[in-house]
Regions:
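Membrane topogenic/interface segments and analogous intrinsically disordered interaction regions
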Residues: 1-240
Length: 240
């Protein structure tokens, strides 16, 4: 009973002209008197199914991935329960904060992917034509595959600060390294953003690139300096 409702109002919502982000773009166009097609375009697509068993398997796979997303907080909680007994009190505090932040950041990434990145990508790719004689017909499989990939990739991309912090604990990444190669990181971030959103317009590129860059800066802030780590180790050794 729930899946048809979720498909119509959540998964397939970006197909419809009244999707919240499309309404927002048109509102911005009206307020600032912008006549560019990017802000005024009316958008509506109808998906087709060309595989007999596709609806059944897509039903199962979509339910699975939605379960993965909604179960993320519980997964992080179980990870915390597993590692916490082996940690010192000050380490537990840091890991607890990191896992809490990781959960929040994952959902922020998923929401950004769902409400902004995927709708913009869908609108561009579904209306892009090699020739006027070629009619675009979007299959259900193609839609779902791209939907899941982009939304989940954005969620995972927002885990960058947590991953970087964990790598720093293992001694594989240092704050000085990230600062030194910041310019290189900016170039890589722009390239990744361009791949994720092949729309070609600067607005969409900025929407993706800016959060990714902020995540990079957050990663730097989360890593402690070597001197601070050494001081804490000396204090902990004295307390023991």
């Amino acid at each position: 009973i729930a899946m048809p409702y979720l498909f119509d109002n959540v998964v397939l919502a970006p197909c419809h002209n009244d999707f919240i982000f499309y309404d927002l773009l048109r509102y911005i166009g009206e307020v600032f008197d912008l006549h560019d097609e990017f802000f005024t375009q009316e958008f509506q697509i109808k998906l087709i199914n060309i595989n007999l068993a596709a609806p059944f398997f897509i039903h199962i796979s979509t339910a699975f991935w939605m379960s993965v997303v909604t179960a993320a907080p519980y997964v992080f909680f179980e990870i915390w329960r597993f590692v916490s007994p082996a940690l010192y009190p000050n380490e537990r505090k840091g890991v607890r904060k990191a896992l809490g932040l990781g959960t929040v950041m994952f959902f922020v990434g998923v929401l950004l992917g769902y409400f902004m990145v995927y709708p913009l990508t869908l609108r561009f790719l579904s209306t892009y034509q090699l020739s006027a004689t070629i009619e675009n017909q979007i299959s259900l499989n193609s839609y779902i595959d791209n939907f899941m990939m982009l939304v989940l990739c954005m969620g995972l991309a927002f885990e960058l600060p947590l991953v970087t912090w964990l790598l720093s604990l293992l001694g594989l990444v240092h704050k000085t390294f990230l600062r030194k190669y910041r310019r290189h990181a900016v170039v890589i971030i722009v390239i990744v953003a361009a791949v994720i959103t092949p729309t070609g317009d600067p607005f969409t590129l900025t929407v993706v690139a800016v959060p990714l860059y902020l995540l990079y800066e957050m990663s730097i802030l989360m890593i402690k300096d070597k001197k601070a780590d050494e001081t804490e180790e000396i204090i902990e050794t004295g307390e023991r």
